[in-house]
Amino acid sequence: MKRILLLFLLFCGGYVHAQELDSARIHYRQGHRNVDVLFRDNRTELERFIRILREEHGTGRLENVVIRSWASPDGANRLNEVLSKRRADSLKAYLVRHAGIPDSIVSMHGEGIAWDMLRRMVAASDMLYKKEVLHILDHTPVWVFDESGRVVDGRKKQLMELRGGR
């Protein structure tokens, strides 16, 4: 049976999931796109995942690697979309080079802002105004438009204005 390895990049980093095999997190410095093996535990996580990629590819069971990447909500939305795509590109090149897998089996999806990850982090925290932040994350659309199609409000705006921006 062929196996599919999934690779997820989350928030300022990434989550690697090898279906039925293993998982690992890859982190990025804020605003950066290049894989940095010296940042946090990236070296250990990448070495382990690359070993799995090599093994699965060597046995012919590796069918596909999917990279999904995200960025934190700070900064402009368009820049976060571009950053998440560039992180996916960078990681693909890194995996192809170090694991020796063909680039044709790697697909990428830059997802922009990691709203779900932010929600999980807030829910697990003891931060001030946690309930209000969760309410905004759960009930406010990313963008709110007026009748003319202009953006008049949104999730990020409400978060930044919550309690006077504290």
At which residue positions do the language-model features occur?
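Soluble non-cytosolic domains of exported or imported proteins
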Residues: R40-T44, D74-D89
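Bacterial Sec-dependent N-terminal signal peptides
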Residues: M1-S23
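Periplasmic OmpA/Pal-like peptidoglycan-binding modules at the C-termini of bacterial envelope proteins
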Residues: E20-R40, T44, I52-N64, R97, ...
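Cysteine-centered nucleophilic/redox motifs
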Residues: I67, L83-A99
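Short secondary-structure boundary/capping segments
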Residues: M1-R3, V82-L83, V122-D126
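Short glycine-centered, acidic/aromatic-flanked micro-motifs in structured strand/loop junctions
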Residues: Q30, S69, R78
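N-terminal glycine-rich FAD/FM-binding segment characteristic of electron-transfer flavoproteins
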Residues: E47
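Glycine- and acidic-rich phosphate- and metal-coordinating loops
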Residues: N64-A71
